[in-house]
């Protein structure tokens, strides 16, 4: 249950969720594409795609927890050439995704949305028209492997404490 598994599973789920969303391009209607990880390098600048990327930007492992957390950034870039109301397309897609994350908090029954941390929605002030961009950041629990190699429960019980003098100064 690695961050890559989370990115792949969440990207697939969002791709299924956004099948009805399209962007009107000069060449016709283009679907919104969801990428796990970074978006591919764009070689054709003639038309800009509408896309979402799913990227784990941070993980946190702490002692005493049986779960680790992964901070996931969902990046949105939605094409809409309407200079007056084009921004609404962005907000519509982001809100659709946000509501889905809240309604269905498990991803593949392996990762769970952690609402002890907020879901954060950010829209940059400067937008590269006709692309409208935003990010949504959410925190998910991911599995944490158990430590191997030393049984701390038996450390002082199995042998007399005096045998561990060498550890006192470390």
Q: Residues of each region from the PLM?
A:
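"Short basic amphipathic alpha-helical interaction patches in structured regions
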Residues: 66-72, 86-95
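Generic marker of residues within folded, mature protein domains
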Residues: 44, 64-66, 124-128
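Small/polar-rich, solvent-exposed N-terminal microdomains that initiate assembly or binding
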Residues: 1-63, 154-170
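Residues at beta-strand starts and edge strands
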Residues: 48-50, 68-72, 128-136
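Active-site-adjacent structural patch at catalytic or cofactor/ligand-binding sites
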Residues: 54-82
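Acidic-leaning, charged glycine-interspersed low-complexity segments
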Residues: 91-149, 170
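Short, cysteine-centered beta-strand-loop-beta hairpins and adjacent loop/turn segments enriched
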Residues: 61-64, 79-85, 141-150
